[in-house]
A protein has these predicted regions:
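Hydrophobic alpha-helical transmembrane segments and adjacent interfacial helices
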Residues: 44-65, 93-100, 116-133, 192-208, ...
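Generic multipass alpha-helical transmembrane bundles of integral membrane proteins
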Residues: 105-235
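Membrane-helix interface "capping/anchor" motifs
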Residues: 29-40, 100-110, 230-243
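Membrane-interface segments at the starts/ends of alpha-helical transmembrane spans
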Residues: 2-5, 66-79, 139-156, 266-278
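A cytosolic-side transmembrane-helix exit/cap motif
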Residues: 61-66, 105-108, 131-141, 210, ...
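Hydrophobic cores of alpha-helical transmembrane segments in multi-pass inner/ER membrane proteins
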Residues: 15-24, 83-99, 159-174, 221-226, ...
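C-terminal transmembrane-bundle signature of multipass membrane proteins
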Residues: 21-25, 217-342, 346-348, 358, ...
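An N-terminal, globular interaction/scaffold subdomain
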Residues: 2-102
Length: 379
């Protein structure tokens, strides 16, 4: 077995997994369906968490007993947790900028690559953490600043390499679209090929480096966006992932007792042999995924990063079918949008459902834009 889920607490541990999974799915729906929900979660709750964490750390620095013994200070003080929560939340805000066309940046062509950049940063944070364990404790173990015993070894290297490969499994960086009612930022080229490779890599990362949290962040936290992405939110997996990751990280930063010290707490078996098997699976999955992407790119004759490689596939078409009507986008586009920005939005939105092989939008000057686009927007 991968986890110690036996004994008197087993019913609570399984119930906790189901509770976390359900809560993440529900909170994701709340955050994605309206501007209020998204702003409440990623501005309001994040601000409250920041104030709380600063208060705890300032209190600890001043020697206050309540702060020195606070679980946020004792159990969540590593660089990784703070880097992860703010990187994930930055991703959520950036995705909202894209789907709501907020500001010049949110409507810029270059900003369509933001999802790739922020996901790559999040992956690199975990890769560094994996390599940290390998360097600190090769074929042995070390105790983190949070008091967690971590093994180190070749499995960290295997999974670190898997994470680096996973970054190159993200294709069609500029193929970002807006869903009906502007509820989702869609990335149709991010299909099951990437999702499976990512989930296996990320599960392995949590198993290697977060053994006290992996039951929840390695299972429930990965299942929540994947279930939504497979069943009702095609093309929106990466937004689901960012939203649920940010919310989970904020919860753990403020209530770490749930996963560390309660009846719901679960430890992995923390066995290097098991770590190695899981890491090899993650590495092989990412090698296969990247190989398949290279194959499709060569078959279509496209650059897999500047252009989409899964055009014509079932998953790609289902995601593209969820795009908002052009008329709705024109009606809801901010009045500050320029004709050039509107023209780009329309060009993306009127691509066929199956996509267009080799499509790469060329940014135009305002003088080249048909004024009819601007007229339609204001009707």
């Amino acid at each position: 077995m991968l986890f110690d889920v036996y004994g008197a607490n087993a019913p609570f541990q399984w119930m906790g997994l189901i509770m976390v999974l359900a809560a993440l799915i529900i909170c994701n729906e709340f955050a994605r369906r309206s501007k209020f929900g998204g702003c409440f979660m990623f501005f309001g709750v994040c601000a409250a968490m920041t104030v709380y964490c600063i208060a705890v750390e300032v209190g600890a620095a001043m020697g206050a007993e309540w702060a020195l013994n606070n679980p946020t200070h004792t159990d969540m003080n590593s660089w990784f947790h703070y880097a992860k929560v703010y990187a994930a939340t930055a991703g959520c805000i950036g995705f909202m900028m894209l789907k709501y066309s907020w500001g010049k940046i949110g409507r810029s062509h270059w900003f369509k690559a933001f999802p790739f950049v922020i996901v790559a940063i999040n992956i690199l944070i975990a890769v560094v953490s994996d390599f940290e364990s390998a360097i600190r404790a090769w074929d042995s173990s070390w105790v983190s600043s949070e008091g967690v015993v971590l093994n180190g070894g070749i499995f960290n290297v295997f999974n670190g390499v898997a994470g680096l490969l996973n970054i190159f499994c993200m294709t069609g960086w500029f193929g970002i679209y807006i869903s009906k009612k502007r509820q989702d930022m869609l990335w149709p080229d991010m299909t099951w090929v990437f999702i499976i490779a990512y989930d296996l890599w990320n599960f392995c990362y949590t198993y290697n480096c977060l053994p006290t949290h992996s039951w929840y962040c390695g299972i429930a936290l990965l299942l929540a966006p994947t279930i939504a992405g497979l069943l009702w939110n095609k093309g929106g997996w990466i937004q689901n992932r960012a939203f649920t990751l940010s919310m989970w990280c904020m919860f753990c930063q403020m209530v770490p007792m749930f996963v560390n010290d309660s009846v719901f707490a679960v430890q992995s078996v923390n066995n290097p042999a098991v770590n190695t098997v899981v890491s090899v699976i993650a590495l092989v999955a990412n090698i296969l995924a990247l190989g398949y992407i290279i194959y499709r790119a060569k078959k279509l004759g496209v650059n897999p990063y500047k252009q989409e490689v899964f055009v014509g596939t079932k998953d790609f078409a289902k995601a593209m079918a969820r795009r908002a009507d052009t008329a709705y986008l024109l009606e809801t586009e901010p009045k500050s949008a320029t004709p050039a920005e509107i023209a780009e939005m329309v060009a993306y939105n009127e691509l066929p459902v199956n996509g267009e092989v080799g499509f790469a939008y060329v940014v135009k000057n305002a003088d080249e834009i048909d004024v009819e686009v601007d007229t339609i927007k204001r009707e």
